[in-house]
């Protein structure tokens, strides 16, 4: 990705565009957009248009994932899920933390990061499981979020539409996944 310029536009000639880079909602005191924003690392940009009459547009978010050099050329025959918390540290066990998820599916039999993600959206993520939460392979609960951190339904990997999902890390129990029907589909 390198140094990628990102441009924000508005159809209104009198509008002031304000944006944030920390995931917060842009407000009247947020950074004023004056020209292309340079993206040099994984970033989330949230922007709103402020009109002189006091009206404010809905928030629009864009997320950019900077992959480590050792995985940029990775490919696989199965779908790949990438989650980035933008430097947020470890995934919490209590409240959902904002993150971004992209799902890549095979094209021509191979999944590659040069393919466009089939799903790319804001999420809330947390670890789950009281007795299993400290194990080497944890499970995660996640919710697909809209611009207001409200649940929104998606259908990842051809599954039914839903907002709440589990990334199940079966580690100590049923390591062979014999009781996990998804593995046998």
Language model regions located:
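Short, compositionally stereotyped local motifs that mark structural "simplifiers"
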Residues: 1-98, 103-119
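Long, contiguous hydrophobic alpha-helical segments, chiefly transmembrane helices and signal peptides
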Residues: 47, 81, 101, 125, ...
